């Protein structure tokens, strides 16, 4: 068979599998050196067995490992016997299907050999091209099979494609699918090259829906629209449309060289892949498989392999109409400092680096040109084109040390879609991506110029603080200074925009939540940039907190470097400039929890609604009631967050998704409200009250009574007060997070008020601060850690899934230990377990245990029988003793009672008379045993009825005649005879051996009882 031949199961495959040179099919089959000619059908030949019978008797064939090698192996061959088995089992064979050879006791290896012989003969006779001289077949097939079991499948049936296709065309079509848009991008030089780097994934649909300055061929538009259908029509065939005309449009070698072998060089480097449905319009199939993270090539290889056909420029083109650039596109300070980088290096930049690079340029340009911001105040969301130097500069800032080595599977696309409903209501700068419902370009930074202007207005006042203020994907108050003014009953600097400005239009993109963030601001220059690695956004995600690896959770970061983009729990309260939606009374003051509806849905409503629907929120009207204060929901919004918060925050997020966020309507003042207020303030801003007490309360102090002393949120004016804030925040946060986590994981809505002031001491010396910091590993809890939890008790501080797993593990351990103890006890109890010299298995132990139990039961039964017999003998002896004692006189005087004496004398006479008569004839004993009850033992017996005290013979004769008339009847004698026969058959072996009856009688005569 040729090497290109399709091999089905059951084939004999190859004659010489070790040969490199494959013989031509039309040539003669090459025979190996065999002693037995009968094995040629198994090795390489199908000739007839017409050799000498002497060859049939030789049991060995020598199998060589190739033509040019001298090694050989001896194989035991019994194919002549197998041939006889075939002829016996099948006189006529019709098909070469697998045969079990039922009725023949064959080893499974022999059955495989027989089926291989049958297939080989069938292949030579019907399938193979016949050579010049036809060979005599080994097996005769009566009729070739009509079924298509072993026929070569010539046409692939794929979703309605029933035509026959060539393998080259299928391969070419598959390769075109792998890089399906490359050909279109080469022809359309002006288009954006979408390589799905970390900085941009272009949406072809967004391009097509915008107005073009030049015409596009209709075929290109149709192909693009066909490739990027929304997911409602995902039931359609995913197979690309078959077009015979362009099947060989370009050379196959060019297709083969697109993805080079350089992909395998850096498989260990992690790469942040977006959601697969968000990059549904991406053009590269390799990055549409985010689940196979370690197997993906790095983006540098994709860029370099496609580098010849791509324009050497960033993926944002200012000359095209794909984006609108703002008017302040003048060279800024950073444009002259950051050098031009190579394009291929830019592909490894993550989302965070793109945000930082653009934020640097935008903040500098905003500071230098504050007057131009008023022109863009009306534009709510505006695409911003990244400059080439920003695009290149962001490529060298990637740090893979803190990126996860595997992508968590807990962030499902459905979760991301469900958390998107309030995304467009937020006025913070966002990143739009093309989901199924998107019509605009993806991953493009969209800036809210109104927010930026307001942010700029505070830059002069709180410049160091605003530099430290970080973007928080958790529910955040983006502008701390504005919230501070609200909480201090001061009027806001900029009036809140109207409701109509906040609501998006129909053309706004449907934003995924995992790309929403506030705009990151530049970090202070005092910190070493190499010491501030970027945390991946999924590390802080509440959706992935339960499945993180222990290393990713328990990695302690420097205190000053907790500045990466935070995670997307969704902006529960973020839509106006101050971070709240004002509905009703806009009077500044405390925020009241109410059931009124607004435009931003909560996370619980998002998780329970369809993807597109937008429900109401629980954060409603802001009334002039300063009793309740709802502090910032940010997790790391203070200037110097400590590493203590990482683990506790992950535990809070893990538990809050399951229990605490499932609230639809919360009434102020209820325990539910208090617990919710405690749960969402895992790390609230530090509350300071003018009271003299130094006690800082725990989570129960979040709803504070502020009628006399309205609290304020301290925002440090400079970086010099960081250490004081850190020392002041360290100890309260420990207890606050612990109690909050315990309450959340227990599911209790009542918040425990911690009143002991000793629990909340403030560390004043560096030694105390170090002691608090050293307790950090005790507070860390990784929900996905497996080995560390095995030795812990399933207390209430664990995640419910982890608690369930630990309980299940303990139950399994108890079950296995009970089984082991039981088997150990059996091995100690049962004798002769080690008689074979080998340690017995559990099955042997159980089998011998059953035998031992049966033997013990048999012994118990035998001993029970002996005990019963002994009890019967004791009973008879007691009766004998009783009868003898009853016959004794009551005194030494002569007895006057003659009745008892006469009965006893008659019994004694009967026994003596029976013994004497049985010695003469053994049959006399048999008759006496039958008559003994009626004569002696019964109450109406002869001995008790006949008057023995009378000296008159007439009276004795009269009593005898009366007794005979009453008792000597057949009805009385028949039961006695049957009872005797039953006792003889039971106590002796007369039924099997009747000759032993005389011996039995003699043995009973010797018995004293």
Swiss-Prot record:
UniProt-annotated stretches for the region Disordered: 1-20, 304-354, 488-531, 686-728
Tissue: Expressed in intestine, neurons, muscle, hypodermis, excretory cell and other tissues.
The organism's place on the tree of life at top rank: Eukaryota
Residue ranges, compositional bias (Polar residues): 324-350, 499-508, 686-695
Chief place where the protein resides: nucleus
Intracellular or extracellular location(s): Nucleus; Cytoplasm; Mitochondrion
Domain bHLH residue range list: 803-856
Description of the deletion phenotype: RNAi-mediated knockdown reduces lifespan, which is further reduced on daf-2 or glp-1 mutant backgrounds. RNAi-mediated knockdown causes premature onset of polyglutamine-mediated paralysis. RNAi-mediated knockdown increases spore levels of the microsporidian pathogen N.parisii during infection, on an mxl-2 or mdl-1 mutant background.
Alphabetical keyword list: Cytoplasm, DNA-binding, Mitochondrion, Nucleus, Repressor, Transcription, Transcription regulation
Example of a GO biological process term: regulation of transcription by RNA polymerase II
UniProt biased composition (Low complexity): 511-526
SUPFAM superfamilies: HLH, helix-loop-helix DNA-binding domain
Alphabetized Gene3D superfamilies for the sequence: Helix-loop-helix DNA-binding domain (4.10.280.10)
InterPro entries membership: bHLH_dom (IPR011598), HLH_DNA-bd_sf (IPR036638), Max-like/E-box_TFs (IPR052207)
Molecular function (Gene Ontology), one example: DNA-binding transcription factor activity, RNA polymerase II-specific
Any one cellular-component term (Gene Ontology): nucleus
Known role: Transcription factor that binds to the E box motif 5'-CACGTG-3', probably in a heterodimeric complex with mxl-2. Involved in modulating longevity in response to TOR signaling, dietary restriction, the decline in protein homeostasis associated with normal aging, germline signaling and the insulin-like signaling pathway. Plays a role in autophagy. Involved in regulating migration of the ray 1 precursor cells in the male tail, acting in concert with Wnt and semaphorin signaling pathways.
The protein's name in its UniProt record: Protein WBSCR14 homolog
The organism of origin for this protein: Caenorhabditis elegans
Lineage, highest ranks first: Eukaryota, Metazoa, Ecdysozoa, Nematoda, Chromadorea
């Amino acid at each position: 068979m040729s090497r290109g031949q399709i091999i089905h199961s059951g084939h004999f495959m190859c004659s010489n599998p070790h040969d490199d040179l494959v013989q031509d099919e039309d040539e003669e089959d090459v025979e190996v050196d065999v002693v037995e000619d009968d094995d040629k059908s198994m090795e390489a030949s199908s000739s007839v067995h017409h050799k000498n019978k002497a060859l049939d008797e030789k049991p060995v064939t020598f199998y060589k490992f190739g033509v040019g090698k001298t090694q050989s192996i001896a194989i035991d061959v019994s194919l002549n016997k197998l041939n006889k088995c075939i002829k016996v089992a099948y006189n006529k064979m019709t098909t070469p299907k697998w045969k079990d050879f039922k009725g023949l006791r064959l080893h499974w290896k022999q059955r495989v050999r027989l089926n291989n012989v049958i297939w080989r003969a069938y292949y030579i006779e019907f399938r193979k091209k016949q050579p010049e001289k036809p060979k005599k077949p080994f097996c005769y097939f009566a009729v070739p099979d009509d079924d298509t079991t072993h026929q070569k499948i010539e046409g692939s049936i794929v979703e309605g494609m029933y035509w026959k296709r060539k393998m080259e065309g299928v391969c070419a079509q598959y390769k075109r699918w792998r890089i399906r848009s490359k050909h279109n991008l080469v022809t359309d030089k002006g288009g954006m090259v979408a390589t799905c780097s970390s900085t941009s994934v272009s949406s072809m649909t967004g391009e097509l829906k915008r107005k073009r300055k030049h015409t596009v061929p209709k075929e290109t538009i149709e192909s693009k629209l066909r490739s990027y259908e929304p997911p409602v029509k995902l039931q359609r065939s995913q197979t690309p449309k078959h077009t015979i005309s362009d099947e060989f449009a370009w050379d196959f070698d060019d297709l083969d060289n697109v993805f080079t072998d350089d992909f395998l060089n850096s498989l260990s480097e992690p790469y942040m892949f977006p959601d697969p449905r968000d990059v549904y319009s991406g053009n590269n199939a390799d990055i549409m498989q985010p689940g196979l993270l370690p197997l993906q090539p790095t983006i540098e290889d994709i860029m370099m392999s496609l580098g010849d056909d791509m324009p050497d420029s960033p993926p944002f083109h200012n000359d095209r109409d794909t984006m609108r650039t703002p008017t302040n596109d003048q060279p800024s300070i950073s444009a002259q400092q950051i050098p031009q980088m190579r394009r291929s290096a830019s592909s490894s930049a993550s989302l965070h680096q793109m945000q930082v690079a653009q934020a640097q340029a935008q903040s500098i340009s905003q500071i230098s040109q504050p007057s131009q911001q008023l022109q863009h105040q009306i534009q709510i969301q505006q695409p911003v084109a990244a400059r080439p130097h920003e695009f290149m500069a962001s490529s060298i800032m990637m740090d893979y040390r803190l990126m996860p080595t595997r992508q968590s599977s807990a962030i499902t696309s459905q979760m991301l879609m469900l958390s998107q409903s309030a995304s467009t209501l937020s006025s913070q700068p966002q990143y739009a991506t093309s989901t199924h419902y998107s019509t605009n370009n993806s991953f493009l930074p969209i800036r809210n110029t109104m927010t930026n202007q307001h942010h700029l207005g505070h830059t002069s006042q709180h410049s160091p603080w605003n530099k430290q203020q970080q973007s928080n994907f958790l529910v955040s108050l983006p502008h701390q200074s504005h919230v501070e003014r609200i909480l201090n009953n001061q009027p806001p600097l900029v009036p809140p925009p109207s409701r109509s400005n906040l609501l998006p239009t129909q053309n706004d993109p449907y934003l995924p939540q995992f790309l929403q963030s506030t705009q990151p601001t530049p970090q202070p220059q005092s910190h070493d940039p190499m010491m501030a690695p970027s945390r991946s956004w999924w590390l802080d995600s509440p959706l992935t907190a339960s499945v993180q690896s222990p290393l990713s959770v328990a990695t302690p970061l420097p205190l000053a470097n907790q500045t990466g983009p935070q995670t997307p729990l969704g902006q529960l309260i973020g839509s106006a400039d101050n971070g709240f939606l004002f509905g009703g009374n806009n009077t500044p003051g405390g925020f009241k929890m109410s059931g009124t509806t607004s435009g931003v849905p909560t996370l619980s409503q998002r998780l329970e609604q369809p993807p597109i629907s937008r429900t109401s929120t629980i954060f409603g009207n802001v009334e002039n009631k300063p009793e309740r204060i709802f502090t910032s929901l940010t997790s790391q919004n203070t200037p110097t967050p400590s590493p203590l918060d990482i683990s506790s925050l992950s535990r809070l997020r893990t538990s809050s998704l399951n229990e605490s966020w499932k609230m639809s309507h919360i009434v102020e003042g209820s325990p539910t409200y208090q617990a919710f207020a405690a749960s969402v303030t895992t790390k609230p801003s530090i509350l300071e009250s003018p009271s003299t007490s130094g006690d800082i309360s725990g989570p129960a102090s979040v709803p504070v009574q502020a009628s006399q002393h309205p609290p304020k949120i301290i925002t440090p004016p400079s970086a010099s007060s960081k250490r004081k804030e850190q020392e002041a925040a360290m100890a309260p946060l420990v207890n606050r997070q612990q109690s909050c986590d315990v309450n959340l994981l227990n599911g209790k809505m009542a918040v425990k008020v911690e009143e002991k002031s000793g629990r909340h001491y403030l560390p004043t010396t560096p030694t105390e601060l170090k002691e608090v910091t050293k307790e950090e590993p005790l507070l860390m809890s990784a929900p996905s850690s497996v080995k560390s939890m095995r030795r812990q008790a399933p207390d209430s501080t664990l995640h419910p899934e982890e608690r369930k797993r630990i309980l299940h593990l303990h139950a399994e351990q108890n079950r296995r230990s009970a089984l082991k103890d039981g088997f150990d006890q059996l091995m100690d109890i049962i004798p002769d377990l080690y008689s074979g010299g080998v340690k017995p298995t559990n099955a042997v132990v159980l089998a011998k245990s059953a035998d031992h139990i049966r033997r013990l039961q048999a012994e118990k039964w035998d001993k029970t029988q002996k005990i019963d017999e002994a009890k019967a003998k004791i009973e008879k002896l007691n009766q004998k003793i009783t009868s003898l004692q009853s016959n004794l006189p009551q005194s030494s005087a002569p007895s006057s009672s003659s009745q008892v004496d006469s009965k006893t004398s008659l019994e004694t006479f009967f026994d003596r008379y029976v013994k004497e008569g049985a010695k003469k004839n053994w049959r006399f004993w048999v008759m006496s045993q039958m008559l003994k009850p009626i004569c002696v033992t019964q109450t109406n017996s002869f001995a008790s009825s006949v008057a023995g005290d009378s000296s008159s013979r007439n009276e004795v004769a009269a009593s005898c005649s009366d007794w005979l008339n009453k008792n000597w009847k057949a009805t009385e004698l028949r039961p006695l005879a049957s009872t005797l026969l039953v006792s003889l058959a039971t106590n002796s072996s007369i039924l099997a051996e009747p000759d032993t009856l005389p011996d039995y009688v003699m043995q009973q005569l010797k018995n004293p009882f």
